[in-house]
Amino acid sequence: PRLSKKALSKSDIESLARGFTDCTSELRSEVIGAWDFHANITKNIASTHIIDKTSNHLNGFIINLPCRGMTGYNWTSDEMVFHHKPEEYGAIHFHDDDIDDARWDVDFTYKVPDLIRSGVYAARLRINGEESAETEDFIPFVIKPPKGKATSKLCFVLPTNSYLAYSNDNLGTNSVVAQLLAGKVPVLAASDLYLNEHREYGLSTYSKHSDGSGVAISSRLRPILNMRPKYRHWLSPSLWQLNADLHLTDWLEEKKIDFDVVTDEDLHLEGVE
């Protein structure tokens, strides 16, 4: 996008369309903002920053992580990898159901005691103290060992990338092959029915946006109703994802085997050491 101080001639518009930096200095002086959607996608495809190429530096940001690195108006099909020719992948695909962060206010915090063991924990929420699928919820979280220090010989890596891929999926209600995949009539939980009515909680990477395009981005910064210890996924007759993995941690505790817990995200950000 380009924003000028005045109405421009057709030739000036065409020149700006070809690229701000290649314009004459006279034309560049008339431009208030020239936002380049491909300027910073090579190393950071999921960046939320939009770069203004003018001296005004009116840099912006995008909300809810729409798909970047999409084929632009000038795409030639000569290169299929966006970072090999980023100038041809300057489009952004916005969806009305994109979400990167629910941006809810903080209701409570928990200070982790120094002596608490590393493990998988959950905050239990209840309505009027009632215990049922409609009145109780568990918000899982991981307590890691102190940074840079292992407290056990065994480290359990929680596969949170897999959890995010299936987070809030609606295949049980939307997919025409749900029964074929499950090998039975899908049994839906209360949270499945709720998510079917409330798509504002975001989708899984197995879902489709409202415009029919596939979902490429999933986020943990929102309620993930099928990442709960008591949730039973429609795809499996028994357990799936987090509640299946909790059987491993339960077995380790039952056998009195000490272990630390970290997540895929920790491994990605901090490395093995």
Label the model's feature ranges.
Residues 111-115:
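Short, surface-exposed loop/turn segments at beta-strand-coil junctions that are enriched for proline
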Residues 10, 41-43, 163, 268:
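Flexible, glycine-rich phosphate/dinucleotide-binding loops
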Residues 12-19, 137-143:
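Short, structured interface segments
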Residues 106-110:
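Short strand-edge motifs at loop-to-beta-strand transitions and within beta-strands
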Residues 65-100, 120, 127-272:
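Aromatic-Pro/Gly-enriched surface loop or interdomain linker
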Residues 3-13:
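Extracellular glycan-recognition modules
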Residues 1-4, 35:
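Short hydrophobic/aromatic patches on beta-strands that form ligand-binding or substrate-lining surfaces
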Residues 14-88:
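Extracytoplasmic low-complexity segments
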